[in-house]
A protein has these predicted regions:
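Bacterial N-terminal signal peptides that target proteins for export
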Residues: 1-7
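Extracellular/periplasmic carbohydrate-active domains that bind, remodel
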Residues: 17-216
Length: 216
């Protein structure tokens, strides 16, 4: 039995201060120009990372996730002065391989989930567009029960990824995207200043525990 989706729409919410719009835009870096396949099977993390790194190194701009394709990817990190823009019907899909997730947002505490899309000690980062970021949550679960999924056995290490983790970022905009199917927390903000979250949708499976929407 499928759980009801949880819809959480945020409209013009300002977190942690009055936020200006990051100075992104400018040059566009299409991730397919850096080798991304967008077939939903190939791990496109290296191509996405290359586009982000080049964009930031060149002074900033927009990293484009093109419309109508699914880009399966392992963890990657954001960079200063970069707007990650998801075109309509595009999707970033978390790699279901648990071994890909090795970094915890809680330093040495590896029992509270890992990071998938993340950034730390950055300036002017934004995630925009009407595409989707899909945490592929069921792939990290055990057996489906009537009202929940079993958690796979863990000791001091829980590989379930948080979808988006931002640590000590100065100026962040998250706008219009749909974030869905998280295996753990969805948006996790730690020590960030000047954050705007506007018009996003969070659609998580209620049978997956710890599927928080936004944790500050």
């Amino acid at each position: 039995m499928r759980a009801k989706a949880f819809l959480f729409v945020l409209c013009s919410i300002l977190l942690l201060g009055a936020c200006g719009t990051p100075k992104t835009g400018g040059t566009i870096y299409n991730i397919m120009d850096y080798g991304a396949k967008g077939d939903g099977v190939t791990d496109d993390a290296a191509a996405i990372q290359a586009a982000i790194d080049q964009c930031s190194k060149s002074g900033g701009g927009t990293v484009l996730v093109p419309a109508g394709r699914t880009f399966m990817c392992s963890p990657f990190h954001l960079a200063s002065f970069v707007e990650l823009h998801l075109e309509p019907n595009s999707c970033l899909l978390a790699n279901p391989d648990e071994a890909a997730y090795t970094l915890s947002a809680f330093r040495d505490n590896r029992g509270e989930g890992m990071m998938w899309i993340y950034g730390q000690d950055l300036k002017e980062v934004s995630i925009t567009g009407t595409g989707a970021i899909d945490g592929n949550g069921v792939s990290f679960m055990g057996k489906e029960l009537e009202d929940s999924y079993e958690l796979k056995p863990v000791t001091d290490f829980d590989p379930r990824p948080h979808v988006l983790t931002l640590i000590d970022i100065e100026k962040t905009v998250i706008r219009d995207v749909t974030i869905r199917n998280s295996a753990y927390w969805t948006v996790h903000l730690i020590g960030c200043n000047d954050v705007s979250i506007d018009g996003i949708s969070i659609l998580n499976n209620l049978k997956i525990r710890n599927g928080d929407g936004i944790d500050v």
